[in-house]
């Protein structure tokens, strides 16, 4: 059974809860989103595995998950990037924000999200239990595709992508 770290609106830990229960009720919990870019400035996207309990088969950012109670968000980001995409990469936390979004089947993501960016030209070696496919996309192509086919993307990615474009100057930090 997996647990998430419950937090207040200042990201102070206030407890733990089983992950699926935290998405049913929903409770604010700590999360992270990774945006890896290649040297051409294209974003590495992943398609969620069809076996995922919510948002299966949808496209999202490079990696996103929840830290364990015993680890920092940076440690969790590195761990999950390796577990999902088979990659190691230096990353920098660039900002945080809170969002709440329904994800279908009566579930809602309510997250205090730590956003990390990094740069790598490595080829992913995906874990097919987590990831169905991957591709690189330019920011312009993503913006157009999200506008035309929003149903192809996870709810949190659409929110996080919009936040990321507002912080576009941060891309110079990678």
Segments the model singles out, each with a brief description of its role:
Residues 18-20, 69, 98, 107-174:
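Nudix hydrolase/Nudix homology domain
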Residues 21-32, 42-79:
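Conserved Nudix-box catalytic region and its N-terminal flanking loop in Nudix hydrolases
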Residues 4, 42-43, 134-135:
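A residue-level structural signature of the nucleotidyltransferase/glycosyltransferase Rossmann-like core
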Residues 1-33, 39:
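Acidic, metal-coordinating catalytic segment for phosphate/diphosphate chemistry
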Residues 26, 40, 82-123:
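Active-site segment of metal-dependent pyrophosphate-handling enzymes
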């Amino acid at each position: 059974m997996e647990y998430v770290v419950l937090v207040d609106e200042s990201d102070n830990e206030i407890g733990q809860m089983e992950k699926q229960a935290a998405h049913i009720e929903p409770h604010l919990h700590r999360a992270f989103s990774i945006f890896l870019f290649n040297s051409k400035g294209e974003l590495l996207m992943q398609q969620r595995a069809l076996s995922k309990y919510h948002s299966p088969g949808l496209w999202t950012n490079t990696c996103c998950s929840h830290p364990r109670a015993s680890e920092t968000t940076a440690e969790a980001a590195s761990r999950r990037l390796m577990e999902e995409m088979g990659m190691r990469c230096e990353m920098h936390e660039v900002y945080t924000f809170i969002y709440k979004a329904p994800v279908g089947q009566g579930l809602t993501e309510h997250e205090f999200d730590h956003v990390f960016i990094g740069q790598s030209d490595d080829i992913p070696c995906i874990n097919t239990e987590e990831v169905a496919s991957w591709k690189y996309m330019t920011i312009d192509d993503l913006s157009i595709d999200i506008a035309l086919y929003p149903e192809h993307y996870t709810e949190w990615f659409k929110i996080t992508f919009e936040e990321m474009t507002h912080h576009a100057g941060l891309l110079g930090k990678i």
